[in-house]
Curated annotation (Swiss-Prot):
UniProt-recorded name of the protein: Glucose-1-phosphate adenylyltransferase
Quaternary structure and partners: Homotetramer.
A Pfam entry, by short name: Hexapep_GlmU
Single biological process term from Gene Ontology: glycogen biosynthetic process
Key words, A-Z: ATP-binding, Carbohydrate metabolism, Glycogen biosynthesis, Glycogen metabolism, Nucleotide-binding, Nucleotidyltransferase, Transferase
Length: 420
């Protein structure tokens, strides 16, 4: 059997579950009215588009999206952008909201979110179940992970990557492996992670992406559901309980293409979210959104093109080293090193620098904004200065991050909130 046909058979026998129910509390007010996977990224996408695109580009066409926290905008986006698959051809992207299928509780943890959908998974008759994190931005060919799982004879395979020890502390599951990448130890979000052999600065962290043999997964979830002391979590409970008696392997994260550096970003804090967007402005960014070999799919709104108007000596509509999305109007204003999402308007004599501006924002005249994240629908009053003096920003009710990024939301401006 050719390698292409072998991979094709593996992906056809796989059902993917994307866990997209988390809030992302370290993003503070940015996720007050949306789940983290519904957060905007890269000018026109949402975070959920990246694991979904990875599935489609990898050949996995049966996908369930598990939702819970403030899921309206997430569900709406997935239905609009990903609802075109044909069930009669064995393709589907389905929404799986918390629905108290087996108890009166909502999803209690990552393992419980899968357990409560066992009947739906079983109906699909997959040989393998892939459980994926829905709140990271990355490019990954899941077919390689599937092939490694099948060839090793593993019961479970955990996708992993090396991260700095300081970054992993309290944030990631950390594992120990032998020379064959079999997992010998696993600790969920330790305060003092064990470093990789021979590298005291790095440790092997779980990406939250797993492959299971289906019946093995069901057996472990049922056992876990009967354990009154369990947190119903893969990292805290399932993995530590099975590594001694079962074959659990680690799979090092690789680029989808040879000779390219693998790309993965957590974007779980205001600083990391801002930084990951800023990286896209490089002439040769680590994440190339223009790569036709691995397209990122999303819901395409029908919008007019961006427009730049006025070319006077005292006001000139211009943008430099920036991403400007559909429907934007830069009217006699200057935008430098910034990411502007759909239908942003920047009015005359204003300057926006080193900032991430989410959709439907209006920046009125004579504003100065730098090192900021402006949430969707904000109307920045005329003459407002943001990002130049952190004490002044805090006095206005804005949030300033550890690294000096200013977050502005509608609520902070006294505008109506509650719908995303």
């Amino acid at each position: 059997m050719s390698n292409v046909r072998y991979i094709s058979n593996l992906t056809r026998e796989t059902y993917a579950l994307i866990l997209a129910g988390g809030r992302g509390s370290r993003l503070h007010e940015l996720t007050d009215w949306r789940a983290k996977p519904a957060l905007y990224f890269g000018g026109k996408f949402r975070i959920i588009d990246f694991p979904l695109s990875n599935c489609i580009n990898s050949g996995i066409r049966r996908v369930g999206v598990v939702t819970q926290y403030k899921s309206h905008s997430l569900i709406r986006h997935v239905m609009r952008g990903w609802g075109h698959f044909k069930k009669e051809l064995g393709e589907s992207v389905e929404i799986l909201p918390a629905s108290q299928r087996y108890s009166e509780n909502w999803y209690q943890g990552t393992a419980d979110a899968v357990f409560q959908n066992i009947d739906i998974i079983r109906h699909e008759l997959p040989k393998y179940v892939m459980v994926l994190s829905g709140d990271h931005v990355y490019r990954m060919d899941y077919a390689g992970l599937l092939a490694a799982h099948a060839e090793s004879g593993a019961d479970m395979t955990v996708s992993c990557l090396e991260v700095p020890v300081a970054e992993a502390a309290g944030a990631f599951g950390v594992m120990e492996v032998d020379d064959e990448m079999r997992i010998l130890g696993f600790e969920e979000k330790p305060k003092h992670p064990k470093h990789s052999p021979g590298n005291p600065e790095k440790c092997l962290a779980s990406m939250g992406n797993y492959v299971f043999n289906t019946e093995f997964l069901f057996d472990q979830l049922k056992k876990d559901a009967q354990n009154a002391n369990s947190d119903r979590d893969f990292g805290k409970d399932i993995i530590p309980s099975i590594i001694e008696k079962h074959k659990v392997f680690a799979y090092p994260f690789k680029s989808a293409f040879p000779n390219e550096q693998a790309y993965w970003r957590d974007v779980g804090t205001l600083d990391s979210f801002w930084q990951a967007n800023m990286e896209l402005l490089s002439p040769t960014p680590a994440l190339n959104l223009y790569d036709a070999k691995w397209p990122i799919w999303t819901y395409q709104e029908q919008l007019p093109p961006a427009k730049f108007v006025f070319d006077d000596d005292d006001r000139r509509g211009m943008a430099v080293d920036s991403i400007i999305s559909g429907g934007c109007i830069i009217s006699g204003a200057t935008v430098r090193r910034s990411v502007l999402f759909n239908e942003v308007r920047v009015c005359s004599y204003s300057v926006v620098e080193d900032s991430v501006v989410l959709p439907d924002v209006v920046v009125l005249r004579h504003c100065k904004i730098k090192n900021a994240i402006i949430d969707r629908g904000c109307i920045i009053p005329e003459g407002t200065v943001i990002g130049y003096n952190h004490d002044h920003d805090r006095a206005k009710g804005f949030r300033v991050s550890e690294k000096g990024i200013t977050l502005v939301t509608r609520d902070m401006l006294g505008l109506p909130v509650g719908y995303e």
